[in-house]
Amino acid sequence: MTDLKPFLAKAASREPLTRDEARAAFDILMSGQATPSQIGGFLMALRVRGETVDEIVGAVTAMRSKMLTVEAPEDAIDIVGTGGDASGTYNISTLAALIVAGAGVPVAKHGNRALSSKSGAADNLAALGVKLDVGPEIISRCIAEAGVGFMFAQLHHSAMRHVGPSRVELGTRTIFNLLGPLSSPAGVRRQLLGVFSPQWLVPLAEVMRDLGSECVWVVHGDGLDEITTTGITKVAALEDGKIRTFELSPADFGVSPCVLADIRGGDGVANAAALREVLSGAKNAYRDISLANAAASLVIAGKVETIRDGMTLAAQSLDSGATALALDKLIAVSNDID
C-alpha cells in the first residue's frame, strides 16, 4: 500500500495501529509517498492520542529497514539520549562513551546535532576534531582501533529527509523524537538510553524487548535524558527478557549531589573545552555525572557486576589516560590519519 489515508483516518479516530499497519504507514512516510499535510496530520494524530508500543515497534522496524548500517562487534554498546530535555548540559553521553571505550568496551555511538540545547553529540565531537561525514567502513575502523565510533544520524537515516520539513513546521515533539535512539545503525543490543520524560521509561523498555535487545537501561534523571547526579534517576531496565524498575541516587555512585548549574554547558566549542579539562584531570560535577553514566554502561555491557565496580573502572579509564587515548585515536582514524 502506498496511500497513507487509511492509516491517517484510523489514527484520527483515536484507534491504535497494529505493528504491521504502523510499519506500512512509516514506510510510506519515509519513502516520500505522503504529502506534507498528510505527514503533519498523521504525526499529530498519534501525538494527541499517545503513541503505543506496537506503533513505535512498527515505526522503528520501518526506519531500521532504510538505514545505512555499520558493522560493529556483537558486544558493542550505545550511550544515547532522545534529546529534548531543554537542559543545556554538557555533553554527558559523549564523555561517558569515551570513558567506556577506554575501559575496554566497544562503543558504537549514535547521535545528531543539537535538538533543544546548544550542543548535541555531533556538535561536541566536531569541535573536538572528529570528522563526522565518514562512511561505514571508517566508523567500523574507529570502533576497532579507537574503541569507539560515531554514527552521525542524518547520514545513516537519509529517509528522514522526507519528514523533516513537516517536523520543523509542526514545531513540537512527535514520535520521530523517539525513533532515532531506537534505530542504531550498528544494530547494538545493549544500550544506556536516556529519555526526555519518565512516561516513556517502561514503554521504551518494552519496545526494545520486542525488538530483540539483550540489556537496555532506559533512564530519566531529574528532568535530564541522562543518569543524573542532581537527584533521583528513574530506571526501567530490560535484562534477560524481563523489565524491572528502580531508582538511583548520587550516593549509589559514591558522588556528592550537584545542582543543574554545575553541569550546564555552552555550545560545541565550549563543551569540547570542558571535556578536555576533565581529560586533563579536573575534578568537578561534569566528571562525576559522566563517570556515573559510564559506570551504568559498564554494568549494561557486562564488564562489571555493580555500579560501584563500574565507578572504579570508569575512574581508572579517565585517570590512566585511556579515555584521552580513545579520543585521540577516534580523531585520527575518522580523519584517516595513519
UniProtKB/Swiss-Prot annotation:
**What does the cofactor section's free text say about binding?**
Binds 2 magnesium ions per monomer.
Encoded by which gene? Answer: trpD
This protein's species is Rhizobium leguminosarum bv. trifolii (strain WSM2304)
Q: What is this protein called?
A: Anthranilate phosphoribosyltransferase
Keywords from UniProt, A to Z, are:
Amino-acid biosynthesis, Aromatic amino acid biosynthesis, Glycosyltransferase, Magnesium, Metal-binding, Transferase, Tryptophan biosynthesis
Ranges in coiled-coil conformation: none
Which pathway is recorded for this entry?
Amino-acid biosynthesis; L-tryptophan biosynthesis; L-tryptophan from chorismate: step 2/5
Whether Glycosyltransferase counts among this entry's keywords is yes
Looking at its record, which EC class is this enzyme? Answer: transferase
